[in-house]
Amino acid sequence: MKLCVALDLSTKEECLQLTKELKNLDIWLKVGLRAYLRDGFKFIEELKKVDDFKIFLDLKIHDIPNTMADACEEISKLGIDMINIHASAGKIAMQEVMTRLSKFSKRPLVLAVSALTSFDEENFFSIYRQKIEEAVINFSKISYENGLDGMVCSVFESKIIKEHTQKNFLTLTPGIRPFGEKNDDQKRVANLTMARENLSDFIVVGRPIYKDNNPRKICEKILQEI
């Protein structure tokens, strides 16, 4: 299980400072939509200069198939290690993205977003007319069949996804509150024990790390646990 630290701070300077504090730790960094829009692709280069961190660019790409493939191709030129697209974009979009990325000698891992961890059952059903678990199983089967590397899901769907695909089909699980911290805007949250029991491959932790007075110590504690 790998730790992915979410760089969701208010400024680029704060993100870079956090990154410097975490230098030499065996972690991934997650760059989200706000940071990428604010700081651009040069921010990725700056992160790579701090240390040889693996970068997950969390843009949740969702558009028509050709536009998605174009976007993923451009992102791949930046040396990104992992990206994500929305599973609800469908199998044609998935196929176009994977075909386009196949020309790279070292392409990024591509994950599909299933049900955002900010959803509870009621709100999810109001949009998709399905229970979360049913939709996630369907999304994961389509993603697996069309060559993606894994899924973004809550901890509670991770094991189910592997049961309906393969054990090596990756799961990245946001909404991790490692030591029982408050949920904030997340609905389907879990701790480290739950993540381990449900076979998560990557856990995403943000606020419990960067809001702490000693982010490095928290990261080290998490790494010891996993």
From Swiss-Prot:
GO biological process: 'de novo' pyrimidine nucleobase biosynthetic process; 'de novo' UMP biosynthetic process
EC number: 4.1.1.23
Superkingdom per UniProt: Bacteria
SUPFAM superfamilies reported in the protein's UniProt record: Ribulose-phoshate binding barrel
Active site: 60
Annotated Gene Ontology cellular component terms: cytosol
Catalysed reactions listed for this entry: orotidine 5'-phosphate + H(+) = UMP + CO2
One of the record's GO molecular function terms: orotidine-5'-phosphate decarboxylase activity
Binding annotation for substrate: 8, 30, 58-67, 117, 177, 186, 206-207
Assigned keywords, A-Z: Decarboxylase, Lyase, Pyrimidine biosynthesis
Lyase listed as a keyword: yes
Record InterPro entries: Aldolase_TIM, OMPdecase, OMPdecase_AS, OMPdecase_bac, OMPdeCOase_dom, RibuloseP-bd_barrel
Pathway assignment: Pyrimidine metabolism; UMP biosynthesis via de novo pathway; UMP from orotate: step 2/2
PROSITE patterns membership: OMPDECASE
Family note: Belongs to the OMP decarboxylase family. Type 1 subfamily.
Subunit structure: Homodimer.
Described purpose of this protein according to its UniProt entry: Catalyzes the decarboxylation of orotidine 5'-monophosphate (OMP) to uridine 5'-monophosphate (UMP).
Protein name as it appears in the record: Orotidine 5'-phosphate decarboxylase
Lineage: Bacteria, Pseudomonadati, Campylobacterota, Epsilonproteobacteria, Campylobacterales
Gene assigned in the entry: pyrF
